[in-house]
């Protein structure tokens, strides 16, 4: 044998991580793909290129990115590019040095972090804090489909193709199909609820609670099944060893790690972030627990799941973990995980092996029907509307990216064939695209906010109390809200809602400080606010804190307003001024919240822009000059109705300024008639010297702006309507310069940063949802 030629023909079993670049071999630059790092970078680049291309098309139909990840995997799979197979032998011919190994490692890390984050962010109290209905649904939705499928799993076993699977493996495959279709994975449900923005709705809470109960059953059965499989297929001794290992993991998690976590929380000052070293230590512990679980023949997600249970949701640890690792997990690791898992699908296997998997398809349909029924029947029994019952059942039956990881783990263990795996993934892909659209048509959370009664100030009965919901985001909102409330009559009912961005949690929380005083932190500004609002004379006050997602805050406000039968909601604007009236900052999140609130609230809305003058004069008992700019329309009439409530306060001097277009003529329009009636009533009131009335004629947009700016110098607070309907004067030249459309044209002029004035503004919109 020629030793030299033999050595020259050898392929090394080890591989290098990084290359010398294209210059290493100019004749064959693809030599860089013989190194693990460039190969992995190229794989990731291809994955995200296809994801971006696909999603740029699908997003125009309102489809979330998840189906794009799956479709990218199918394109890169055996049907077209076959990226896995091409990459497999790039590093070495040794199977242990598979070229897909590094990418597979990233995929597993994504699965681990997702399981951990979802467990941390879901409140364990959620399962049993929403009554008996979710407990019944969660229990039945697992037991009934599982037992129903188990009863028919042995049918049609006579004609099993031995080249497909052995009879015993076919039965095991059917059990996997039955159990996977009976289970409900929380990340999938949370994804759909978040996409539809109904996490804090009644339907969302019901489905989340039921899913958590179902998950408990599914996890227990899964652990038991793996122990039984180890007992039968490996050895009883190994099964006993694995059982002891699981018990040790549980004991270490709850008896050792949980006290350590509590110690970290206790030594972290309130309102301060937890030290980075603890955050990184938690993540390393999660990865170590996954390795431990895998070593003892359990699913590697068991360890992260247990550690997620012992980590307290929210600040300081939960929020710190979210801030440092969630963006990386959800935007990088999860797309890679989903695409990599989907690349293993071979759609042609479904066609070629249909005769072997048709009964699995039947089992999926059968168990899905049973789960749908067990979700609907309890809902209908509890008088839940039919469409909402269907929506709840669809959510319980939904499959998406979380199930992909479950299917892949069973495929890795050879419990299911590639044909069955591909069909399950295809069903998850179809679910991800169709379920959100179907749910949007079945369930609209805004329906409950539609006002079948007039919930505004103008239609309030004379002997009725004025019910106000005032919202606060920051400490500086408190003094402005209290000052404004002091101008109103003493017979008002005030609900204060403190809005807090949800961090480190998934499910929103609403805390009533009147019922749960012990949950109010004594040294926090919200405790000060509670005391300050309580000292308002002859005012009935209720206080809540809503901890929720930024894009769901408007829904929480609407829900509280509906429960409290509120006539008007007062919210701060996104602009912040210093005490001396200088512009300081603008909060775009608050502006977006106000815009959403204007579209969905079931009562009137008031957006308060405080330049400092209102807080200063209101708290120091100075007299206040209030001006109302009246042009016409229902918003202006509502603003006038609110201001007329202030006339009983001797500190408040009210002036109504009507702006009249030089081209205005009498009209039979209903709004014009109502405006005329309101103004006639106001002129009668003027005779009592409680409200002054004046008129000014304007000829166009520039004169409107000049008039409004001059008026701002004469008053401490100006109240205006947001929209003026058909009564609007010629606003030519003004609409194009509006910076804050949520305030309307006049409100935007008064809240402008260029306006040299200390005047505060309240922009009023009358109830829209009627």
From Swiss-Prot:
Q: Which Pfam families does UniProt cross-reference here?
A: CHX17_2nd, CHX17_C, Na_H_Exchanger
Assigned keywords, A-Z = Antiport, Ion transport, Membrane, Potassium, Potassium transport, Transmembrane, Transmembrane helix, Transport
Q: Which GO terms describe its cellular component?
A: membrane
For this UniProt entry, the molecular function terms from Gene Ontology, in alphabetical order, are: antiporter activity
Does the record bear Chloroplast in its keywords?
no
Q: Where in the cell is it found?
A: Membrane
Please report the record's description of how this protein sits within the membrane: Multi-pass membrane protein
Q: In which tissues is it expressed?
A: Expressed in pollen.
State the source organism's domain of life. Eukaryota
**One of the GO biological process terms:** proton transmembrane transport
Q: Which residues cross the membrane?
A: 37-57, 61-81, 103-120, 132-152, 175-195, 206-226, 244-264, 277-297, 327-344, 361-381, 423-443
The family line of this record is: Belongs to the monovalent cation:proton antiporter 2 (CPA2) transporter (TC 2.A.37) family. CHX (TC 2.A.37.4) subfamily.
Role according to the record: May operate as a cation/H(+) antiporter.
The protein in question is named: Cation/H(+) antiporter 12
Lineage from the top down? Eukaryota, Viridiplantae, Streptophyta, Embryophyta, Tracheophyta
């Amino acid at each position: 044998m020629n030793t030299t030629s033999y050595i020259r023909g050898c392929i090394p079993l080890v591989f290098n991580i990084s290359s010398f670049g294209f210059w290493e071999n100019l004749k064959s630059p693809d030599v860089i793909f013989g190194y693990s790092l460039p190969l992995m970078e190229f794989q990731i680049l291809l994955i995200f290129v296809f994801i971006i291309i696909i999603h740029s098309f699908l997003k125009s139909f309102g489809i979330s990115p998840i189906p794009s990840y799956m479709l990218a995997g199918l394109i890169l799979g055996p049907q077209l590019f076959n990226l896995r197979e091409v990459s497999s032998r790039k590093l070495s011919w040794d199977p242990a040095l598979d070229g897909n190994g590094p990418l597979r490692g990233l995929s597993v890390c994504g699965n681990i972090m997702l399981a951990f984050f979802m467990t941390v962010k879901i409140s364990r109290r959620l399962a049993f804090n929403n009554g008996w209905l979710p407990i019944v649904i969660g229990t039945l939705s697992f037991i009934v489909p599982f037992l129903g499928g188990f009863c028919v799993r042995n049918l049609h076993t006579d004609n099993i193709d031995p080249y497909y699977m052995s009879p015993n493996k076919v039965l095991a495959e059917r059990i996997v199909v039955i159990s996977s279709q009976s289970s409900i994975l929380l990340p999938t449900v949370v994804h759909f609820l978040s996409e539809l923005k109904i996490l804090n709705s009644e339907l969302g809470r019901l489905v989340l609670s039921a899913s958590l109960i179902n998950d408990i059953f599914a996890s227990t059965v899964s652990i038991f099944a793996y122990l039984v499989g180890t007992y039968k297929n490996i050895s009883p001794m190994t099964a006993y060893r694995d059982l002891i290992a699981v018990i040790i993991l549980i004991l270490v998690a709850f008896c050792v790690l949980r006290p350590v976590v509590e110690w970290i929380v206790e030594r972290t000052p309130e309102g301060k972030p937890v030290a980075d070293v603890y955050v990184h230590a938690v993540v390393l512990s999660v990865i170590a627990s996954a390795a431990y679980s895998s070593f003892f023949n359990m699913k590697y997600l068991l360890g992260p799941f247990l550690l997620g249970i012992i980590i307290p949701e929210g600040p300081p640890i939960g929020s710190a973990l979210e801030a440092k690792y969630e963006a990386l997990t959800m935007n990088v690791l999860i797309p890679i995980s989903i695409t990599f898992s989907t690349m293993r699908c071979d759609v042609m296997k479904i066609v070629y092996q249909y005769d072997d998997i048709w009964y699995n398809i039947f089992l999926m349909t059968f168990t899905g029907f049973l789960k749908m029924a067990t979700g609907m029947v309890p809902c209908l029994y509890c008088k839940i509307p039919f469409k909402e019952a269907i929506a709840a059942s669809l959510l319980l039956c939904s499959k998406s990216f979380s199930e992909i990881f479950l299917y892949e783990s069973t495929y890795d263990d050879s419990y299911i064939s590639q044909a069955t795996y591909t069909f399950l993934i295809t069903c998850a892909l179809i679910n991800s695209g169709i379920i959100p659209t179907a749910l949007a048509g079945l369930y609209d959370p805004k329906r409950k906010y539609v006002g079948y009664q007039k919930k505004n100030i103008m239609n309030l009965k004379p002997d009725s109390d004025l019910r106000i919901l005032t919202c606060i985001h920051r400490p500086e909102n408190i003094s402005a809200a209290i000052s404004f409330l002091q101008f109103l009559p003493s017979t008002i009912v005030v609900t204060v809602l403190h809005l807090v961005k949800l961090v480190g949690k998934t499910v929103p929380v609403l805390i009533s400080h009147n019922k749960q005083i012990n949950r109010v932190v004594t040294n926090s500004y919200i405790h000060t606010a509670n005391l300050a609002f309580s000292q308002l004379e002859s005012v009935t006050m209720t206080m809540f804190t809503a901890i929720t997602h930024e894009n769901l805050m408007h829904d929480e406000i609407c829900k509280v307003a509906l429960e409290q039968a509120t006539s008007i909601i007062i919210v701060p604007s996104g602009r912040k001024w210093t005490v001396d009236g200088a512009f300081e900052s603008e909060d775009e999140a608050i502006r977006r919240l106000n815009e959403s609130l204007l579209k969905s609230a079931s009562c009137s809305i008031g957006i308060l822009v405080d330049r400092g003058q209102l807080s200063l004069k209101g708290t120091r008992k100075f007299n206040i000059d209030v001006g109302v700019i009246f042009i016409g329309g229902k918003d202006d009439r509502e603003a006038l109705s609110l201001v007329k409530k202030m006339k009983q306060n001797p500190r408040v001097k009210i002036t109504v300024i009507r702006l009249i277009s030089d081209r205005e003529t009498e009209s039979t329009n209903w709004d014009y008639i109502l405006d005329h009636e309101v103004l006639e009533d106001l002129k009668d009131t003027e005779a009592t010297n409680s409200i002054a009335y004046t008129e000014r004629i304007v000829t166009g947009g520039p004169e409107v702006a000049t008039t409004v700016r001059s008026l701002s110098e004469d008053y401490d607070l100006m109240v205006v309507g947001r929209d003026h309907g058909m009564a609007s004067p010629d606003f030519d030249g003004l609409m194009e310069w509006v910076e804050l459309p949520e305030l309307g044209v006049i409100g935007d002029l008064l809240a402008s940063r260029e306006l040299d004035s200390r005047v505060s503004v309240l922009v009023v919109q009358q109830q829209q949802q009627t």
